[in-house]
Amino acid sequence: MSSILDIGSEFVAEAKNGDFTALIQLFDARVKGWGKTMAHEEEMTVGLFSDLVYEIPSYCAFDMVDSAVDICMQQTSFDGFNCALDLIASLVIKSNTTEVPEKLRAAFPEILVKSKRFGGEPVDICTLIRGHYRNTL
């Protein structure tokens, strides 16, 4: 049985080093190939970007939040938006800092509005992001 992490795996090495184009390619491949934030595999549950988050250095995760915000702002479907929010949250947590990237700060009000319009998991992910930043967003 193959893993969802096999989808787009050729882009992980470049994405973990801060390549925005590779991050977009990874995102597009995973959303098209699976489209959900998690998968229950044979012996474990994995997140859509677990491999990237495991390998990316914290300083690079911080830098890639801006790219993930750009991806998020372009999403029109529930699944795309939800997966983009999950990517943002994963990078935010991996960044190991409570310093809010400026692009995220600027876009967060619009992201919240869109999350509330979709409802459900996107709202929960926004709450997680806010909690990481100690509710300063």
Task: Describe the residue ranges of each PLM region.
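N-terminal "cap/leader" segments of large eukaryotic alpha-helical scaffolds
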Residues: M1-E42
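Boundary/linker elements of alpha-helical solenoid repeat scaffolds
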Residues: S2-A15, E43-I56, A89-N96
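Generic alpha-helix detector with strongest preference for long hydrophobic helices that associate
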Residues: I4, G8, R30-G33, T37, ...
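Residue-identity detector for glycine
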Residues: G8, G18, G33-G35, G47, ...
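Generic structural signal of hydrophobic/aromatic residues within well-ordered alpha-helices
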Residues: F11, L23, F27, T45-F49, ...
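HEAT-repeat alpha-solenoid elements in large eukaryotic scaffold proteins
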Residues: R30-F49, F78-L91
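Extended alpha-helical scaffolding segments
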Residues: V53-L137
